[in-house]
């Protein structure tokens, strides 16, 4: 599972809920939540508006808790660079949400005989301003 690492999980500007969250209740679901010591939900951060959410779905939380899923925090830089690579090589502009999954691929090791399937959802054209402004930095 790829989660939004934001500016890095050590910075506090992140939405890496599984890695940094504590068990809590959000929107009626018991799951990992980014919260302070008093249990108050804190504002997460991600370059992707679709990923800056302080909770995680209970199914993903359970898979992570049982160690049935590998969870990787992908920071903004990694996601953007992975998106640029897909766009350059394949002509596909991924949405920022999918760019995080692409960024996770770089952190994994595969054997030549492995079959890897990654779905690219959404449309990157809605994120074009973010991609362009990131490139100007």
PLM regions: where:
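Catalytic phosphate/nucleotide-handling subdomain of diverse soluble enzymes
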Residues: 2, 10-11, 104-137
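Short, electropositive, low-hydrophobicity segments enriched in small/polar residues
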Residues: 54, 95, 126-128
């Amino acid at each position: 599972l790829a989660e939004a690492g934001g500016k890095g999980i050590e910075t506090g500007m992140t939405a890496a809920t599984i890695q940094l969250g504590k068990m809590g209740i959000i929107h009626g679901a018991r799951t990992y939540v980014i919260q302070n010591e008093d249990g108050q939900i804190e504002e997460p951060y991600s370059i992707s508006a679709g990923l800056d959410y302080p909770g995680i779905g209970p199914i993903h939380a359970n898979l992570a808790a049982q160690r049935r899923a590998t969870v990787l925090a992908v920071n903004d830089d990694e996601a953007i660079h992975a998106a640029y690579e897909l766009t350059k090589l394949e002509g596909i502009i991924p949405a920022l949400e999918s760019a995080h999954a692409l960024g996770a691929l770089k952190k994994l090791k595969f054997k030549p005989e492995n079959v890897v399937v990654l779905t690219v959802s959404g449309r990157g054209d809605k994120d074009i301003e973010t991609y362009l402004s990131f490139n100007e930095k």
